[in-house]
């Protein structure tokens, strides 16, 4: 045999195609504490056995290719290959299976969400043997978690910076999202903040357009923040969107926010990309800025039940890449969100140790080994009548982000903010007194209306507004 086709062990190379299961199916494998574990929902093509499909996923997302190659003999495949160690049928679904795959830690670059996703959700999602494939969950081992900085500051540090405790934080997205001049935009911010909100927000698609360049917006918003702080005696903030066409421009905008002395900036982490997001998170920690994350484009990736990536995986990835807030649905508003599923990934964002719980879609126990937590942001079609449910569902460590539910108040932005703040304070007080928000919520809001004309007007205008549609992404 010629040297070109001889392996390290001196055994001849046998060309050809062999079943993936001969190499990648290891049902007796005991997972290691250092393995990254993945749960994939597979829909094989007709005639493709589930075992072969699961092994193809393990192979194509790690060391495998479609045919045997002679360079396999130049490394130790048993050390580096992904292993499909279990396959379970999905109850109630025809021809759907959950394939569990273990990846050795050495396959991944330290501190790189980009590299992790390039491997695990790369070419395998276009594999012809699969009709559909969805990544349902990942177990990130402590050994890998410790290579990430994570959120720039986290929940407790943010509360200390703001000096605000014992309640959810309140925010508002400025509307109309596009078309306002910088000066009028700053005026809208000021009215909301002086009315009682903690934060206002750039919409995700506000960057630097002809009608409002970013630097002008930053200056007028900073003026609004300082003026509202002087009037209310509270620390205020506005999520200045630093998302840009290049990383250099993004960091320049963040640096301007720092120089203006404002507390927080914002990034669209999926459209901006994980490399850019991680770079911004490092900058924010080094320079004392909080980082708000918007998930624009997430539904393209996560909404279909049988294909894509579940949001709980995107949420874990954000906690690793870095962000102090992230939008997480509302359960009760206009955007998709099953209650149990939402509470599952909310815990994955906030808590340090989360037990496996399939009833909430959590496939693996996750230990974050003290990586800072992330505030979930409830946003999308919410108003004062939703406040009891939002307070009960999300608890104190959350941001309740209104938009039309503040700016649509018949008396203007500041009264809309007053209505939001009064309804929140009423719900928190009622909860602290032992009242049941889920059962008594409407009564609590009506009682608060008696001493707040702003809240009464808000309740009247939105009393018939509901968003009742079937949830697409269920367990």
Swiss-Prot record:
Binding site for Mg(2+): 201, 203-204
Enzyme class: lyase
Cofactor note: Binds 1 Mg(2+) ion per subunit.
EC number in record: 4.1.1.39
Positions of substrate binding: 123, 173, 177, 295, 327, 379
N6,N6,N6-trimethyllysine PTM positions: 14
Keyword Metal-binding carried by entry: yes
Gene Ontology biological process terms in this record: photorespiration; reductive pentose-phosphate cycle
Domain of life: Eukaryota
Record's keyword terms, sorted: Acetylation, Calvin cycle, Carbon dioxide fixation, Chloroplast, Disulfide bond, Lyase, Magnesium, Metal-binding, Methylation, Monooxygenase, Oxidoreductase, Photorespiration, Photosynthesis, Plastid
Localization terms from the record: Plastid, Chloroplast
PROSITE patterns cross-referenced by the UniProt entry: RUBISCO_LARGE
Record propeptide residues: 1-2
Residues modified to N-acetylproline: 3
Cofactors, names only: Mg(2+)
Pfam families the UniProt entry points to: RuBisCO_large (PF00016), RuBisCO_large_N (PF02788)
Active site: 175, 294
Role this protein plays: RuBisCO catalyzes two reactions: the carboxylation of D-ribulose 1,5-bisphosphate, the primary event in carbon dioxide fixation, as well as the oxidative fragmentation of the pentose substrate in the photorespiration process. Both reactions occur simultaneously and in competition at the same active site.
NCBIfam families: PRK04208.1
Similarity comment: Belongs to the RuBisCO large chain family. Type I subfamily.
Other facts noted in the record for this chain: The basic functional RuBisCO is composed of a large chain homodimer in a 'head-to-tail' conformation. In form I RuBisCO this homodimer is arranged in a barrel-like tetramer with the small subunits forming a tetrameric 'cap' on each end of the 'barrel'.
Protein name listed in UniProt: Ribulose bisphosphate carboxylase large chain
Organism: Marchantia polymorpha
Name of the gene this protein is made from: rbcL
């Amino acid at each position: 045999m010629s040297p070109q086709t001889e392996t390290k062990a001196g055994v001849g190379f046998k060309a050809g195609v062999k079943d993936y299961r001969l190499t990648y199916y290891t049902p007796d494998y005991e997972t290691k504490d250092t393995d990254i574990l993945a749960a994939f929902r597979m829909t094989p093509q007709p005639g493709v056995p589930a075992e072969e499909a699961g092994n193809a996923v393990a192979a194509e997302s790690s060391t495998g290719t479609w045919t045997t190659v002679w360079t396999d003999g130049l490394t130790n495949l048993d050390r580096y290959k992904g292993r499909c160690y279990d396959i379970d049928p999905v109850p109630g679904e025809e021809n759907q299976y959950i394939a569990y795959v273990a990846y050795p830690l050495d396959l991944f670059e330290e501190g790189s969400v980009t590299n992790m996703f390039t491997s695990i959700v790369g070419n395998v999602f276009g594999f012809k043997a699969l009709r559909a494939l969805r990544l349902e969950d990942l177990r990130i081992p402590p050994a890998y978690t410790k290579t990430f900085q994570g959120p720039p500051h986290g929940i407790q540090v943010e509360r200390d910076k703001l000096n605000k405790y014992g309640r959810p934080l309140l925010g508002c997205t400025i509307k109309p999202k596009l078309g306002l001049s910088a000066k009028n935009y700053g005026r809208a911010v000021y009215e909301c903040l002086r009315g009682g909100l903690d934060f206002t927000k750039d919409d995700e698609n506000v960057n630097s357009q002809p009608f409002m360049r970013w630097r002008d917006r930053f200056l007028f918003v900073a003026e609004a923040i300082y003026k509202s702080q002087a009037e209310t005696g509270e620390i205020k903030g506005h999520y200045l969107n630093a998302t840009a066409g290049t990383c250099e421009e993004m960091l320049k905008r963040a640096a301007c926010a720092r120089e203006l002395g404002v507390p927080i900036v914002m990034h669209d982490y999926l459209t901006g990309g994980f490399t850019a997001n991680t770079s911004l998170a490092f900058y924010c920690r080094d320079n004392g800025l909080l980082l708000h994350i918007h998930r624009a484009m997430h539904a393209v990736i996560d909404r279909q039940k049988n294909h894509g990536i579940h949001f709980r995986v995107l949420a874990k990835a954000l906690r690793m890449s870095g962000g102090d807030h992230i939008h997480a649905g509302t359960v009760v508003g206009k955007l998709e969100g099953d209650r149990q599923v939402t509470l599952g990934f909310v815990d994955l964002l906030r808590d340090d140790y989360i037990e496996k719980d399939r009833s909430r879609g959590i496939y693996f126990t996750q230990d974050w080994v003290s990586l800072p937590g992330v505030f979930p942001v409830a946003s999308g079609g919410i108003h004062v009548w939703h406040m009891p449910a939002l307070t009960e569902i999300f608890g104190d460590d959350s941001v309740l982000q209104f938009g039309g539910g503040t700016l649509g108040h018949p008396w203007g932005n500041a009264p809309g903010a007053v209505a939001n703040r009064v309804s929140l304070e009423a719900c928190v007080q009622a909860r602290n007194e032992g009242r049941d928000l889920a059962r008594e919520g409407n009564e609590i809001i009506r009682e608060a209306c008696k001493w707040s004309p702003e809240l009464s007007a808000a309740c009247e205008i939105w009393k018939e507004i509901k968003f009742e549609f079937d949830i697409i992404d269920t367990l």
